[in-house]
C-alpha cells in the first residue's frame, strides 16, 4: 500500500511538471523554421526594399503594419518627410516598393503570420499608424522597459528593433532572444 501511495504521488508530481513544460513551450526550438510561431513575421527578402529602405534603418518587415499604413508611408509627400529625412524615390521604385509592402502587410490575404494577425487585430480600422511603435500591441509589449534603457547610446530609440531583438532580422521577436545593451536578457 505504501508503494502504491508513493507511485501515485510521483505520478501526480510528474504530470504537474510536464504541464508546466508544455505551458512554457513558445515554439522556441522551432523558432526560425516554424512560420506559425506566435513571435514571427516573414523576414524581408525583397532586394529593392533592402537597398532603398533597409540601407538607412532596420528593414521593418511588411507584416508589422497593415496595408493602409504602408500606403500612407509610401505617399510621395510622406517620403519627402520620412521621420525627418527625405526618402523620396522615383515613381517606378515607389510603386514597386508599395506593391511589395502591401502584398506582405499584416492584413494581406497571403500573410499567415500569427504575429502579423495579432498586430493587425490590435489596430483600429479607423487608425493608420505610420510607425510600428505607435501601435497598441507594440506599446503594451514595451511598456515595462525603463526609458533609460531605450535612450542609451547603444539603443537610441524604441524604433531600433535590432538593438535588443537579436533575431529581428529573421523576423523573430520572441522574448528569449531579447538582450538589451548594458542590461542583458529581458524577461517579462
Question: Model-predicted segments: where are they?
Answer:
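Bacterial N-terminal signal peptides
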Residues: 9-17
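Sequence context surrounding c-type heme c attachment/ligation sites in exported
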Residues: 22-54, 59-95, 99, 105-106, ...
Amino acid at each position: 500500500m505504501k508503494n502504491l501511495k508513493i507511485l501515485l504521488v510521483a505520478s501526480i508530481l510528474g504530470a504537474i511538471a510536464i504541464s508546466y513544460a508544455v505551458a512554457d513551450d513558445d515554439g522556441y526550438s522551432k523558432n526560425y523554421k516554424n512560420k506559425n510561431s506566435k513571435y514571427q513575421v516573414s523576414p524581408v527578402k525583397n532586394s529593392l526594399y533592402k537597398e532603398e529602405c533597409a540601407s538607412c534603418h532596420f528593414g521593418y518587415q511588411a507584416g508589422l503594419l497593415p496595408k493602409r499604413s504602408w500606403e500612407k508611408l509610401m505617399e510621395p509627400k510622406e517620403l519627402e518627410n520620412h521621420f525627418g529625412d527625405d526618402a523620396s524615390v522615383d515613381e517606378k521604385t515607389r510603386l514597386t516598393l508599395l506593391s511589395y509592402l502591401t502584398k506582405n502587410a499584416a492584413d494581406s490575404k497571403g500573410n499567415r503570420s500569427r504575429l502579423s494577425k495579432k498586430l493587425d487585430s490590435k489596430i483600429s480600422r479607423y487608425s493608420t499608424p505610420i510607425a510600428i511603435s505607435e501601435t497598441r500591441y507594440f506599446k503594451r509589449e514595451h511598456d515595462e522597459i525603463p526609458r533609460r534603457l531605450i535612450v542609451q547610446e547603444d539603443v537610441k530609440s524604441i524604433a531600433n528593433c535590432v538593438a535588443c531583438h537579436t533575431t529581428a532580422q529573421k523576423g523573430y521577436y520572441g522574448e528569449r532572444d531579447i538582450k538589451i545593451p548594458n542590461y542583458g536578457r529581458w524577461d517579462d
